[in-house]
Amino acid sequence: MTVATTPILVGMGLCYSVSCQSVSCVSCCSSDDEGVRKVALKLPHGSKGVTWVQNKFQPVDINKWLEQIYKKWKPTGWLCYNDDLPEGQHTTRGHCKGILTWNDTRIGWLIHSVPRFPQTFDGSALSPIGQAELIYGQSFLYVEQSRIHLSLEDVLRQIEWMKPNFFHKHNMPPVIPYNSTPLEIKILRWSPTIIHLAKSPDHATDFIGVELQKGNDVEWFEESWKRGSEYAKHQGLTSIETLTIDGTTFNSSQDHSKWAVTQDHVWIGDLNHMKSQEKRGGGGMVITDDDLASAFLSFLASLGFKKS
């Protein structure tokens, strides 16, 4: 496992000042270390969505997509986390949502944007998305990795850094938290092309507009829920207002997804680009993939963007 704290963008590739633990830098970045990666976006008003298959987005029913992920999973432990709990109460804990599953050989991690989800989960079956949450668009990223390349304790430590609400827990081991300043953005390398960034709620910062852009000379386009005080426009970041996905055009006000894209990278995660989110924990995964980035950029028809 590789942990880093200082992101540096070199050219169009993300590089990191890293300190390696558990395994060497060579082995944790080897070419056979990619693991499983699934991306999906739900469209507003229903369960219709798209999923990334064979280098293109294809139509999918998002509840069936989620069902297939866990149908054949045989985990020995799991946990769910969400700032909006299934019982309905809203909290000010970490603004992050996900499901972590594991067994003796593998770790699976779903990062999503759906409040109060899942209502039920037993490791291999989960409740469908509730009707109230089908109104808006949502984002999903599922990754799976061998425990040869990744430590469960390191992943749990990364999640705990964001201080979320845990629920539906089973067989969760004790975890020693990070012993460092909360002003660090914690970086966990999941695979050679995927990293996870985690912000503590004690670090009051604009995650998308500042932390995601650090050392970054390229334009980011961000899509996130905006209900509250927004930031003034600034160089290097454009907020998306209209999307066209699978022939459906809708405004970002109908979309609860959280993602951002450059020409070569895609971030999928937790936080919205609003000032109120500075005091919330959260983060997300950055994926280095030209084809995936191009597909996300194709949704931005209203901006007239074309990849060079």
Explain the meaning of each model-derived region:
Residues M1-S308:
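PLD/PLD-like phosphodiesterase catalytic module centered on the HKD motif
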